[in-house]
């Protein structure tokens, strides 16, 4: 289906010259002089080659039909990351390059949205927020409760993040999966 270039977002899949590309970043640029353009950074699905394209914001681009379905993460092995469709119990192996930065956040039994095109996995989408325990951080410093400074911390999944000074080792915290940033203490 043809769509206007300015409506494309990260994660969309476009068909360019008969090849499928997943959009990594999409930015609408409005220069002071001249016509506005949409800058797209894309990765070719077949071989992982990254390209950059510019389209006029009103230009038509062919968007590929992609099926988004919830899948349950099962396990990881030499073949990749294995997910199961909870409706049909069908299993699918997703290569590590498709999982990408989401790998440390995957937990057995968690539900993710898996995008496929003709049965080929393209992208996975994690829940926006997840809860983890802090396994290592500096000790709590008294008197720094009102300060806006942050200290480094290591989460139970191996990801490093920054947390406020009042958070200590063993505390469960909510993290944004998009960038690994601290949101709040877990309320559980």
Curated annotation (Swiss-Prot):
Its main location: cytoplasm. Keywords: Cytoplasm, Elongation factor, Protein biosynthesis. One of its GO terms (molecular function) is translation elongation factor activity. SUPFAM superfamilies: Nucleic acid-binding proteins, Translation proteins SH3-like domain. It is found in: Cytoplasm. Pathway: Protein biosynthesis; polypeptide chain elongation. GO terms for cellular component: cytoplasm. This is Elongation factor P. The lineage of its organism: Bacteria, Pseudomonadati, Pseudomonadota, Alphaproteobacteria, Hyphomicrobiales. The gene is efp.
């Amino acid at each position: 289906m043809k769509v206007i270039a300015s409506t494309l977002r990260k994660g969309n899949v476009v068909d360019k010259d008969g090849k499928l590309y997943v959009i990594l970043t999409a930015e609408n640029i409005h220069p002071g002089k001249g016509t506005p353009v949409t800058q797209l950074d894309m990765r070719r699905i077949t071989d992982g080659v990254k390209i950059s394209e510019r389209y006029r914001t009103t230009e038509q681009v062919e968007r590929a039909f992609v099926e988004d379905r919830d899948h349950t993460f099962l396990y990881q092995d030499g073949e990749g990351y294995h997910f199961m469709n909870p409706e049909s119990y069908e299993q699918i192996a997703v290569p590590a390059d498709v999982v990408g930065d989401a790998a440390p956040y995957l937990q057995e039994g968690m539900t993710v949205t898996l995008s496929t095109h003709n049965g080929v996995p393209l992208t996975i989408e994690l829940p926006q927020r997840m809860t983890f325990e802090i396994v290592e951080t500096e000790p709590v410093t008294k008197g720094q409760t009102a300060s806006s400074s942050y200290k480094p911390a290591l989460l139970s999944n191996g990801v490093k993040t920054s947390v406020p000074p009042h958070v200590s080792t063993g505390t469960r915290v909510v993290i944004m999966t998009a960038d690994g940033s601290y949101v709040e203490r877990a309320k559980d």
